[in-house]
Amino acid sequence: MEQYLKVYDALHKINIPYEIVEHPPALTTEEADNYIVGKEGVRTKTLFLTNKKKTAYYLVIMDDAKRLDMEYLAEILNEKRISFGSPERLMKKMGLPPGVVSIFGLLNNDEQDIKVYLDKEMLSERLMSFHANDNTKTIFISTEDMYKFITSIGYEYNIIEL
């Protein structure tokens, strides 16, 4: 099954409405933003991170306009150091290549060993945008439905201030 169809199927099963925008391939949030100009909602970036020993995995979701202070995040996570997960580890854990990471990749994490962190600053917005596990599709869902999606597939999320 195509990756994006898994996303649509999961959203339909839990009655989450969404809007989809199809566009040419976009490997960065900046590229994707060019195709969704004028649409309401936070343009999110989703970062797949790991600790130094590669024994813990994190998905950090934040406004794409914001820069992440990795040292500060490592402190919050009680880790000595964090870094981006390798493309190979990302494929193994989420079934996705770089440039396509979003909360919907959690659908592919059979071990359910990724911890989810949401930046508090963006959560007052009504809508969020994500890749639909395909970099030719941007999906918009409400912030409340984002919470619902995460918990419906068996994950907890943590709200942090970045």
Where do the language-model regions lie?
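Extended, low-hydrophobicity, polar/charged segments
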Residues: 1-162
